[in-house]
């Protein structure tokens, strides 16, 4: 995939959710996730499928107050991002590392790394 197309997919992905629930574009997000999409993260583990990822991201975005991109690295169809999110539940600022694999104009894989301690506490009070 050309770098410009990869860049377009990445920018569209973050645009679907980075500004919180009021501008969350669920249809746009679903349209950019490949049929063989797989998500991996510290709370959900490794899960195939668009539905569980979309619903999980939507739940997170409901708590999102702000997002600041810190760093981006790209290598062909793969990209890595480091960003901070301000969230209301659990309250605070949390750092995330996210790795995307893109092909044919769609996202095939998202791997998310973050300290899930406070999120687990909030999910199981």
Feature names for model-found ranges:
Residues 1-125:
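C-terminal and inter-domain tail/linker signature
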């Amino acid at each position: 995939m050309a770098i410009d197309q990869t860049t377009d997919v990445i920018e569209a992905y973050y645009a679907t959710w980075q500004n919180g629930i009021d501008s969350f574009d669920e249809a746009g997000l679903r349209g950019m996730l490949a049929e063989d999409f797989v998500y991996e993260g510290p709370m959900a583990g490794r899960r195939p499928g668009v539905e569980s990822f979309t619903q999980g991201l939507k739940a997170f975005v409901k708590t999102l107050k702000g997002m600041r991109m810190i760093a981006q690295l790209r290598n062909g169809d793969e990209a890595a991002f480091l960003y901070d999110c301000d969230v209301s539940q659990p309250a605070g600022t949390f750092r995330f590392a996210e790795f995307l694999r893109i092909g044919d104009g769609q996202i095939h894989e998202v791997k998310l790394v973050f300290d899930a301690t406070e999120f687990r506490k909030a999910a199981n009070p």
